Amino acid sequence: MIISLREMGQRCKKYRVHRGYYQTDVAADTGYSVENISSFETGRNDNSRILLWYFEHGMKPEYLFERNGEHGPEI
């Protein structure tokens, strides 16, 4: 299943919030600005290095590609 950058960003944000992280946490760990993280989570930035942060913090790739994110961010 192919998802849009916007949907990918929304799922990453949902995962981040569910885990209790803030955009400032992602920014500090990746070296990117909060504005870059916000752009990623709204689909305006497709930086794969930012995406790696979510995987490094436990998000499973399956969550990005399942239909409608039906299992939620806990998978």
Predicted regions and their residues:
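Recognition helix of helix-turn-helix/homeodomain-like DNA-binding domains
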Residues: 31-46
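Conserved hydrophobic/aromatic packing and binding residues within compact polymer-binding modules
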Residues: 12, 26-27, 37-40, 64
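The alpha-helix within a helix-turn-helix
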Residues: 16, 27, 54-55
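A short, Lys/Arg-rich alpha-helix, primarily the initiator
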Residues: 1-18
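Short amphipathic recognition helices of helix-turn-helix/homeodomain-type DNA-binding modules
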Residues: 64-75
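Helix-turn-helix DNA-binding elements, focusing on the entry/boundary residues of the two helices
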Residues: 12, 23, 34, 51
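DNA major-groove recognition helix of helix-turn-helix/homeodomain DNA-binding modules
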Residues: 46-65
